[in-house]
Amino acid sequence: VLTDFGIPKVIGGSFNMMALDVYKQIIGQQNMSMGAVISILLLLPAVFVFIFDRIQSKRHARFQVFQAKPYVSASNKKLEVVLSLFCGVVSGAILLIIFTAVLASFIQSWPYDLSLTLAHYSFEYVDGGGWAAYFNSVRMALFSTVFGTTLIFMVALLTERFKAHPFIKNYVQALVLLPLAVPGLVLGIAYILFFNQQSNPLNVLYGTMTILVISTIVHYYTVPHLTLTNAIKQIPLQLDQAAQTLGTSKWKTFWKVYLPMCFPALCDVSVYIFVNAMTTVSAAIFLYSPDTSLAAVAVLNMDDAGDTVAAVAMSILILTTSCVVKLIHWLFTRKIMARSQQWRESSH
């Protein structure tokens, strides 16, 4: 919430936020120094909360009971009905907002001319990138999903299953948690200051799709890493010992054991990265070029230009794409994974 950028920019009006100040200083006034100062102020609360959470987690870890039995609560029909109604009201309110946006994207001129049209989806007379920006987002999301999932899985596997010095292991574990405490705006500014220097050999990456993919993977690295680490920890170490006894290579063990057993987590991580890559704004707003404009950035640009309905139409495209990917993931998990993951049921 503290570092949110998209919502305050669209509906915040004159109510100022630190995230908006960063954007105004860098994009509006080209004042990189002041933008960096505000970014540090924006970073401090997140770092303090992150450190506090780590201290509390270590403190509570000493009192964990590892041999616990699941608690089965007594059935309370009245309470269940009340909670179901409450959840239904909240879900209905969210769906109503989404339905309004979907309906508005098909209306000729809201709320004056309510005739239906597809003209807003042509993006022919609006700035922001149009369909090119949408396909850039899909391409960037696919690249981030493939390379990000592969990289994160390799790092998690090397950290958990291969012998390494305790210092290196602790350093990697601390490093992968760092993006969770760093706001996307701060990451974006850091990328500008580093990659935009002409003397930097990596300057060729600035303004390309590659830097957008890298920033997206780094920004959303922590949650997938923790997910895959937890999946790897569920695999018994005895399987490694058995494979070593049989003379099986590490590559074959990875291909025949780790990859199939971690496949559900890999699918979850892939969907997580894809959806977040489709909707990312905070870091990408500083890194895109006219050739690599993204759909989420195009929504902000269209809204700034007064093309609100076109911005809504682009938002619906992003939402639809994410929902389709999630639906494919759900069907794949339901149909195929049920057969490939029978070992989990037999182990209980």
Question: What role is predicted for each listed range?
Answer:
Residues A36-K77, A156-K163, T229-D240, Q244, ...:
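C-terminal transmembrane helix and the adjacent membrane-cytosol boundary/short C-terminal tail
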Residues P8-G13, Q67-S73, I107, P111, ...:
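Membrane-interfacial helix termini and adjacent extracytoplasmic/periplasmic loops
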Residues V89-H165, L175:
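Phosphate-binding active sites in nucleotide-utilizing proteins
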Residues L2, P8-L43, V47, L79, ...:
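Interhelical loop and adjacent transmembrane-helix boundary motif
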Residues S75-S84, M154-Y191, H348:
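Cytoplasmic-entry segments and transmembrane alpha-helices of multi-pass inner-membrane transporters
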Residues L2-G6, F52, L96-F99, L103-F106, ...:
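Membrane-embedded alpha-helices of multi-pass transport/permease systems
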Residues V1-T3, L85-L95, L178, V182, ...:
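Transmembrane alpha-helices
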Residues L43-F50, Y71-T100, N170-V176:
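N-terminal signal-anchor/first transmembrane alpha helix
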